[in-house]
Structure formats: structure tokens, C-alpha cells
Curated annotation (Swiss-Prot):
Record family assignment: Belongs to the malic enzymes family.
GO cellular component: cytosol
Cofactor note as given: Divalent metal cations. Prefers magnesium or manganese.
Source species taxonomy: Bacteria, Pseudomonadati, Pseudomonadota, Gammaproteobacteria, Enterobacterales
Positions that bind NAD(+): R157, D270, N418
GO MF annotation: an example: malate dehydrogenase (decarboxylating) (NAD+) activity
Cofactor(s) recorded in Swiss-Prot or TrEMBL: Mg(2+); Mn(2+)
PANTHER family listed in its UniProt record: MALIC ENZYME-RELATED (PTHR23406), NAD-DEPENDENT MALIC ENZYME, MITOCHONDRIAL (PTHR23406:SF34)
The protein, known as: NAD-dependent malic enzyme
Matches recorded under HAMAP family: NAD_malic_enz
Organism name: Klebsiella pneumoniae subsp. pneumoniae (strain ATCC 700721 / MGH 78578)
Length: 565
């Protein structure tokens, strides 16, 4: 059975009775009309009153408010998702600001840690290494025939929480919920996948409730061959799918991206999505301060695949603004646990090599340290922008922030590590230490901060501003690849929707209530660039806009007609 996004067409449904009520994509619960109850053998299986979806959503909202902890709210919402997806997305849409942190970061981190404990019902595909010889059969078992977006993880680097084994499935489920909520992609077109390649988390291996393969992680050639077999099977089943890599370990994330980005329509959200939203935020923050990104000096704390991916996108944007690549690289400084990345450092990873600073150019620095700390770098570089992707809490100390503020009246500080327990500094501290003069954007949601009687909204530099629009743009345009230029177009479009840029004040990023508008705009920009680059069929702007509108799913019930299987 094919699901269509065409809103005014009736759906022809072969299921009836209790089977239909157990089908989350089709179940309406108490909203089935009397005619549908008669036609689909539902008479007597539901209470008498026929409700609207808004009446159902109001009851769900009242029930939601009865839960006291965020994890209990998460479990409740996931139960609705697994019972009635249309109602789930209507409820989320009605209370987006309240519920987005519950269905995704930061609450999803706890849900991943407790996945086997709170497990209720299967969702998505669990591909175990033990079943590596049955990949085609596994994918044929998926009821969604027209899958257009897949989010896949192997659970090894879940947020800042490390190896969660199959508990990492919470991330693809949550991520795809945002593709639908923010980007209008029908849930019938989405598929979460976790690769169960074992776990090195001893706590999970010892947990009698753990539901994954109790085995140390496979590695090296064995691992890469398995991933390749899975991707080839996905290509055979859904050749035009958009595949998003999510929360793979640093040692695997970049190699997998480089290996497959020109073989299948794919991207890594931790590397490219984080980079795109960060660059968009920095463009907006720079313009809000009356300058360009190319005029800034940028220091990173964290030089893993995500940090280096952001740095490379920043460098590309600086080059777009007129500097040479060499000049751009001299404005970006990467600090990891061993200090500033410099030439001659041992054990640098391949993606770090182009981001080192030359030791000979640091001879005038005011320091005697061999390993240059974050404080050394801030004191000597005098940066305008400080970005944290370290996954380690509290490393943006008062001394470091005050040192930065001493040389920069409006510092841009972005502690991006997730979840909130891993943030490099809280917005409250950053703004207090800078007398409210810092521009702050975080990776996790934070409430507004009050300093000296003035309230400051905190922009959440969340990838959900970017990846839903990219997904919608790829689907609407039929793009066969996700290129760097498409990602840069997404960044620029996000910056154009900044209240700070457009109004001269307010948050750096748009409000969540406007995220669907932003996603549509990003989809158009991404689709247009895809056409210009030849990775999508060229159409008129009007046709592309119509395709975006046609593919934008809304959580509304459709009329059902009965048919045979």
C-alpha cells in the first residue's frame, strides 16, 4: 500500500477492525466517523462519541501535564506516536516549544540510556551483525514501501553520552520526528535504523534487561564490510533515499561520510548539519554586530569530526566573503585536550591536518607553555567567537570568558555540547561574566536569562533549523546528492531569517514557532542549488515551490475507503 501526501484524496485502506486500530500511521482512534466505523468493522470497538483531532489533542495535552518528569513525558509522547502518529504530530505542533526538548535533546539522552528499561513497542529496523546474511529479507519486512529519508546510527557516540548500543535507536526516532514536525516530511516516508554491532559499554553488557547483541563492538574491516553491506542493501531497496548518518564515533564518522557521500544521497548531521546551523548562526550574529564573518577570529574547544567539520564550513564561508583560503585558515584556531593544534603535533587525525597553526607564527605569543591551553589561545588570539564542541562541562571558565570580553565588547560564545549536562558554560554564567554583552547560542535549550534586570533570549543552535529543510528540499527537487554548496545555501537562508539581523534586536535565530517557514525557505534554496549543480532536474522556481508545498505533510485525518489487499 502506498501512502500519498495528497491531502484531499481519500486513502484506500485494506485493513479493518483491531488491525487498523493497531496501525499507527492509519489509526484515528475516536475520530473515526460512524460511516468509517461501519465500513471498517470498528462498531463497538470505540466509545460512542466521534471526536475531532483537536479534541483528541486537548485530552492528550491534559494527560501530558499530569506527568512530573521529563522522561515520563517522553515515554507518554512516544506511546502516542506508536499508537496514532497523526495525533502525535498535531499535539507536538500545538506545543512545539514545550515538547521539542522532550522528544529530542536533552530528554532523548536519558531515553537512550534507559532504552531497554523503558522499551514498549518496536519502531524502525534493528539490523544486527548476527543477521548480516539476511539484510535483503530484513529490509523487505519494512511495511513502508516508499521510504524517502533514513536516519541510521550504530549507537557508539550518542550525544555526549558515549556508547549506548541499540539504545541509540532513540536518536533516529527523535530525529525523524523533527523531520516531520519541522520539515513536513510524511512519517510514512521515514525510517529509523540502528546497526547493532555490539557494545563496549560494560554496564549494558552486564544489564539483564539489555536487548542488544551482548558482544564487544566489531571493528576495522569487519565493521566497514558490514556497514557497506547494509548500505548496498538500502540502495537496492530504496535507490533514491536520503540517508543521514547520526552519532557515529569520531573514528568512523568522517570515513563513512567521505566513502558514501558521492555514492548515495547522504550526509552526516553531526558534521555537516552542525556546521551548517553554526555557520548560519555566525553569519547572523556577525551581521547583527555590523560586520562579516570574514572579519572575525574564531577559537574552537573540541577538534573532533564535528568541530573540524564546522571549522571547514566557516572557512568556506570566509572564502566566499573574499579572503583567500590561507587567510581564512589563519583566523580559525582549534584547541583539543592536548592544546592548540599546531604543526608537528603527534597523532593528528587526517581531518585535523589542514586546521593546524604554524608554530613559527606563534613565537610572539605571551606564553611559556609548550602545550597551548584554551586560556593561552584566548589571551593571544583575542577572538570574537568562541565555540565549544568538547562534550566536557564547565571548560569555559569565568577567567576565559572575562579574558575574551576584555578585548571584545560583544563576544559571540557558543557552548554547543549536548545534552545540557555537558555544556561548556551556562548562558547565565556567560552573560553574568560579560555584563549581558555576549551573544550566546547553545546546543541544548535554555530558558531566557536575566542580568541586571534585563532579559536575554537564548538562541538554540539546533540542527533542527537545518536538516528538515534539507530533507524537504532533497525530496521536492529529487536531488541525488547533498553537496557542500547546498549546505551553504541552507546556512545563508537561516541567517536571512534572523530576528537580530532583520529587526536590529532579539534572538540570533528564529523562534521555534517559525521553524516550518524557515524549513520551507531552506528547502527552496537547497533545491535551487541542487538544480544549478546538476544533481536535480532543472525546473522553474514556481514548479519547485509547488513541489515543496505538495510534499509538505500536515497532521490532518484523511477520509478512508475500504479496499482489498
Amino acid at each position: 500500500m502506498q501512502f500519498t501526501h495528497k491531502k484531499n484524496r481519500s486513502l484506500y485502506i485494506p485493513y479493518a477492525g483491531p488491525v487498523l486500530l493497531e496501525f499507527p500511521l492509519l489509526n484515528k482512534g475516536s475520530a473515526f466517523s460512524m460511516e468509517e466505523r461501519s465500513n471498517f468493522n470498528l462498531l463497538g470497538l470505540l466509545p460512542e462519541v466521534v471526536e475531532t483531532i483537536e479534541e483528541q489533542a486537548e485530552r492528550a495535552w491534559i494527560q501530558y501535564q499530569g506527568f512530573k518528569t521529563e522522561i515520563d513525558k517522553h515515554i507518554y509522547l512516544r506511546n502516542i506516536q506508536d499508537t496514532n502518529e497523526t495525533l502525535f504530530y498535531r499535539l507536538i505542533g500545538n506545543h512545539l516549544e514545550e515538547m521539542m526538548p522532550v522528544i529530542y535533546t536533552p530528554t532523548v539522552g536519558a531515553a537512550c540510556e534507559r532504552f531497554s528499561e523503558i522499551y514498549r513497542r518496536a519502531r524502525g529496523v534493528f539490523i544486527s551483525y548476527q543477521n548480516r546474511h539476511n539484510l535483503d529479507d530484513i529490509l523487505q519486512n519494512v511495511p513502508n514501501h516508499n521510504v524517502k529519508v533514513i536516519v541510521v546510527t550504530d549507537g557508539e557516540r550518542i550525544l555526549g553520552l558515549g556508547d549506548q548500543g541499540i539504545g541509540g535507536m532513540g536518536i533516529p526516532i527523535g530525529k525523524l520526528s523533527l523531520y516531520t514536525t519541522c520539515g513536513g516530511i510524511s512519517p510514512a516516508y521515514t525510517l529509523p535504523i540502528v546497526l547493532d554491532v555490539g557494545t563496549n559499554n560494560q554496564q549494558l553488557l552486564d544489564d539483564p534487561l539489555y536487548m542488544g547483541w551482548r558482544h564487544p563492538r566489531i571493528t576495522d574491516d569487519e565493521y566497514y564490510q558490514f556497514v557497506d553491506d547494509v548500505i548496498q542493501a538500502i540502495k537496492a531497496r530504496w535507490p533514491d533515499v536520503l540517508l543521514q548518518f547520526e552519532d557515529f564515533a569520531q573514528k568512523n564518522a568522517m570515513p563513512l561520510l567521505n566513502r558514501y557521500r558521492n555514492e548515495i544521497c547522504s550526509f552526516n548531521d553531526d558534521i555537516q548539519g552542525t556546521a551548517a546551523v553554526t555557520v548560519g548562526t555566525l553569519i547572523a550574529a556577525s551581521r547583527g554586530a555590523g560586520s562579516q564573518l570574514s572579519e572575525q577570529k574564531i577559537v574552537f574547544l573540541g577538534a573532533g569530526s564535528a568541530g573540524c567539520g564546522i571549522a571547514e564550513q566557516i572557512i568556506a564561508q570566509i572564502v566566499r566573503e573574499g579572503l583567500s583560503e590561507e587567510e581564512a585558515r589563519q583566523r580559525v584556531f582549534m584547541v583539543d585536550r592536548f592544546g592548540l593544534l599546531t604543526d608537528g603535533m603527534p597523532n593528528l587525525l587526517p581531518f585535523q591536518n589542514k586546521l593546524v597553526q604554524k608554530r613559527e607564527q606563534l613565537q610572539s605569543w605571551d606564553t611559556t607553555s609548550e602545550a597551548l591551553s584554551l586560556l593561552d589561545v584566548v589571551r593571544n588570539v583575542k577572538p570574537n567567537i568562541l565555540i565549544g564542541v568538547s562534550g566536557q562541562p564547565g571548560l569555559f571558565t569565568e577567567e576565559i570568558i572575562r579574558e575574551m570580553h576584555k578585548h571584545c565588547p560583544r563576544p559571540i560564545v557558543m557552548p554547543l555540547s549536548n545534552p545540557t549536562s555537558r555544556v561548556e558554560a551556562t548562558p547565565q554564567n556567560i552573560l553574568s561574566w560579560t555584563d549581558g554583552e555576549a551573544l550566546v547560542a547553545t546546543g541544548s535549550p535554555f530558558s531566557p536569562v536575566t542580568v541586571k534586570g534585563k532579559q536575554y533570549p537564548i538562541a538554540q543552535c539546533n540542527n533542527s533549523y537545518i536538516f528538515p529543510g534539507i530533507g524537504l528540499g532533497v525530496i521536492a527537487s529529487g536531488a541525488s546528492r547533498v553537496t557542500d554548496e547546498m549546505l551553504m545555501a541552507a546556512s545563508e537562508t537561516l541567517a536571512q531569517h534572523s530576528p537580530l539581523v532583520n529587526n536590529g534586536e532579539g534572538p540570533v535565530l528564529p523562534e521555534l514557532k517559525d521553524i516550518q517557514t524557515v524549513s520551507r525557505a531552506i528547502a527552496f534554496a537547497v533545491g535551487k542549488v541542487a538544480q544549478e549543480q546538476g544533481v536535480a532536474v532543472k525546473t522553474s522556481a514556481e514548479a519547485l515551490l509547488q513541489a515543496i508545498s505538495d510534499n509538505f505533510w500536515l497532521p490532518e485525518y484523511r477520509n478512508y475507503r475500504r479496499t482489498s489487499i
